[in-house]
A protein has these predicted regions:
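Glycine- and Gly-Pro-enriched alpha-helical subdomains that act as flexible
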Residues: 286-318
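Conserved alpha/beta cores of soluble small-molecule-handling proteins
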Residues: 2-276, 282-286, 329-426
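Feature captures the catalytic cores and cofactor-binding loops of soluble hydro-lyases/lyases
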Residues: 321-326
């Protein structure tokens, strides 16, 4: 064994206890000197190069000369391909110089070398958020600050560059300010667009290493409404030989590597008539996520107390969903006299037991794509757990209230600080 791998006296040094957290701190210092105590100095005291930070005020504009037609209402894809708006934003980064000036330019292909880091080592992260045309005529984005903060966490987790989340938010708003008025016209209240900020490692060199070049880009696309399936969502629990995430891993980060390995099980579940996988973890079968959405149950305790229960964030098994956070906040603020909001580990056996005892009231999934979606059935090891899901599977009373409150905020029926209004004066 190499001497460096042989701790003295059988004890691990303090510097070995949390390598990932230390690496994240150093990554932040490298690309955000203004966010550190001393500009240009990392937390380990090593002098850092004077690199450029991400700066939305440097955004340049090159408008398309070939604008495309907006698809008819209800059309969201073209021969199976996503339909995107006229423009996108790109920003290059290098370890030597930091962030280049952002560019708003016509939507089109990216140029990558076959040896680009992202194509071999999954150095990729992304976010998903929506812009809404309100019934009051205004254009809004729902809580973009939360998505930008989460993208920073995802980026540094896979050794991509850091940035100030507020600058990314400004770029998102700038892109929607240009494309929003055309692609979400006032004549289509109640419609939305899907925004996808993405960062990829672009360094053209094979070898397992942190990329020294990266590209941040933001695109906007149409997406079919993923409303609650008729009768409610049906889940199939994950097989014993497969997990989506694990303690000490990266299930909490929105990285592409979390999604590809789950597609096989999801495809098989859909072939059997189910909509998503309910991902279980550990020998006790802890409930974690429903597909790529956060999972909730509403039940009564044996003492008669109604609880809204979801998995916790402290072990980093699940994604800290923006909709999840919004649901929890609204439940605590507006349902405090009716329900107790609980974030804890709970198992599929607890769900089955609550159902058998008549204590399982409702269940739903939350996320940007499915929003708040009632769950009507969970299939586990050959048996079905039937869950009350309201009339037509549209959701029970608690699910519906939470969903309707969020709809009102997103579409401007309720003025709320979560709905960020986009300027349309560009």
């Amino acid at each position: 064994m190499a001497p460096s791998a042989n701790p003295q006296n059988g004890h691990r040094g303090e510097q070995d206890l949390d390598l990932t957290s230390s690496a994240v701190e150093h990554r932040l210092a490298e690309n955000q000197p203004s966010a550190t105590n001393t500009a240009g100095a990392a937390s380990n005291g090593v002098s850092q190069p004077n690199v450029q930070e991400l700066d939305a005020s440097k955004l340049t504009y090159t408008f398309t000369e070939n604008p495309r037609e907006i698809p008819a209402l209800g059309v969201t894809a073209d021969n199976g391909n996503s339909i995107c708006t006229d423009h996108m934003i790109t920003v290059k980064w290098s370890a030597k110089d930091g962030w280049a000036a952002p560019e708003l330019r016509p939507y089109g292909p990216l140029s990558l070398m076959p040896t680009a880091s992202v194509l071999h080592y999954a150095t990729e992260c992304f976010e998903g958020l929506k812009a809404y045309r309100g019934y009051d005529g205004k254009l809004r984005i729902f809580r973009p600050d939360r998505n930008c903060e989460r993208m920073l966490m995802s980026s540094v987790r896979i050794s991509l560059p850091s940035f100030a989340p507020k600058e990314l938010e400004k770029l998102i708003l700038a892109l929607m300010s240009v494309d929003g008025p055309k692609w979400l016209p006032r004549e289509r209240p109640g419609s939305f667009l899907y925004l996808r900020p993405t960062m990829i490692g672009t360094q053209s060199q094979l070898g397992v290493q942190a990329p020294s070049e990266a590209l941040l880009y933001i695109i906007v696309s149409f997406m079919a409404p993923m409303d609650a399936p008729e009768g409610g969502m049906k889940l199939h629990t994950s097989p014993d030989d497969m997990v989506r995430a694990w303690v000490g891993g990266f299930g909490y980060a929105k990285v592409g590597a979390n999604y590809g390995p789950s597609l096989m099980a999801t495809k098989e579940a859909r072939a059997r008539g189910f909509h998503q996988i309910l991902w279980l973890y550990g020998k006790n079968g802890e409930c974690t996520e429903a597909g790529a959405s956060n999972f909730f149950v509403v039940w009564k305790t044996r003492e008669g107390k109604t609880q809204v229960v979801t998995a916790p964030l402290d072990d980093r098994l699940i994604l800290a969903g923006v909709t999840r956070n919004s649901v929890l906040n609204l439940a605590r603020e507006r349902l405090a006299e009716e329900v107790e909001v609980v974030e804890r580990k709970y198992t599929i056996d607890e769900v089955i037991e609550a159902n058998a005892e008549g204590r399982l009231i409702e269940s739903f999934a939350s996320g940007t794509a499915y929003f708040v979606c009632p769950i009507s059935l969970i299939h586990h090891r050959g048996s079905d757990v039937q869950i009350p899901a309201g009339k037509g599977g549209e959701g029970g009373p608690i699910t519906l209230r939470l969903k309707n409150w969020l709809v009102d905020i997103k579409y401007g029926r309720e003025e709320h600080p979560w709905g960020i209004v986009v300027s349309e004066e560009h």
